[in-house]
Amino acid sequence: MLNPPLNQLTAKVNSKYLIATTAAKRARELDERRETALLDQYQSAKPVGKALEEIADGKIEPVVPKEYLG
């Protein structure tokens, strides 16, 4: 089961694609230890789970270039 739940994630970001790409990018950063942890405590031990928790908590948001906004 996905933790945090998908409906909690889509409440913050309305696109599953943006959730996936943002989480993947952040997970790579966490895995490479470039960034420090944004939450005091994580439920997940894996970088992707940690990234999803950060998205659900509103600590990170996707960045969409202006040319893609229409």
UniProtKB/Swiss-Prot annotation:
> What Gene Ontology terms describe what this protein does at the molecular function level?
DNA binding; DNA-directed RNA polymerase activity
Domain of life of the organism encoding this protein: Bacteria
Which GO CC annotations does the UniProt entry carry? DNA-directed RNA polymerase complex
Q: Which InterPro entries match?
A: DNA-dir_RNA_pol_omega, Pol_omega/Rpo6/RPB6, RPB6/omega-like_sf
Cross-referenced Gene3D superfamilies: 3.90.940.10
Q: Which SMART domains match?
A: RNA_pol_Rpb6
EC assignment: 2.7.7.6
Partners and quaternary state? Answer: The RNAP catalytic core consists of 2 alpha, 1 beta, 1 beta' and 1 omega subunit. When a sigma factor is associated with the core the holoenzyme is formed, which can initiate transcription.
PANTHER family recorded: DNA-DIRECTED RNA POLYMERASE SUBUNIT OMEGA
**Family the UniProt entry places it in:** Belongs to the RNA polymerase subunit omega family.
Role played: Promotes RNA polymerase assembly. Latches the N- and C-terminal regions of the beta' subunit thereby facilitating its interaction with the beta and alpha subunits.
Name of the featured protein: DNA-directed RNA polymerase subunit omega
- Give the organism's phylogenetic lineage: Bacteria, Bacillati, Bacillota, Bacilli, Bacillales
